[in-house]
Amino acid sequence: PEVIITPGERKKVHVGALVAGGGITGSALMRYLAEAGMKPVLINHDRGSSWRNIAGGRPNFSVPELSDIARHNHEIFKELQKISEVNYREIKYVTFAHDDVMMSQLEASLAWTDGEIVMPSDYAAKIAPGINPDLKKRYSAALLTNDCWQATPGKVIDLIRHLGVRAGGSVEEDSTVTGVSRNGREYNVIVQNHRGEYIE
């Protein structure tokens, strides 16, 4: 087994669950584990891609199962907006068909997606008045999808974490997981916190 040597004595803490990574996925996992009574600890190092994205979603996918997951995610965003202001708003999503294969996929997705095919002559009227007119030459059509949404990433993550902490979870910011080993049914995790201390 690998032995990790750290300076000084390591404080040892037993937790019900440990989540490494505090983006949208890790924060949501911490929230749901907390609501299940597991008293999880979320270890977050920095601000990753979840803080830089548009915090939105769309139900337009090439398979219906992914669209179904997206619709359920949309319901979660609506619930979050009812709890606190996350700048949630419904939008439309545009996917351009760059070849016949893509066009066939977009048309097929209408069986499980609320949207419409937009022809090049209607791009300005249905997508945006100032749209680049050269797109008419490049793309044979576009799919305009309804039931899409956006929200502010930081507000969404902060609210999700707040709900998790309120339910019994905790967050360790500016911390790093430096080692993980398995011990039977449990895991030993070594974390360096923001004070430079090592905790197991």
Residue ranges and their predicted role:
Residues 1-17, 32-36:
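Extreme N-terminal leader/targeting segments of oxidoreductases
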Residues 12-15, 194-200:
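Core beta-strand elements of the Rossmann-like FAD/NAD(P) dinucleotide-binding domain
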Residues 19-20, 42:
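Hydrophobic Val/Ile/Leu positions in short beta-strands of Rossmann-like dinucleotide-binding domains
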Residues 99-173, 179-185, 190-192, 197:
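Flavin (FAD/FMN) cofactor-binding and adjacent substrate-gating region
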Residues 21-27:
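Glycine-rich Rossmann-fold phosphate-binding loop(s) that bind the pyrophosphate
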Residues 54-130:
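Dinucleotide-binding Rossmann-like beta1-alpha1 core, especially the glycine-rich loop
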Residues 34-51:
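Glycine-rich FAD pyrophosphate-binding loop
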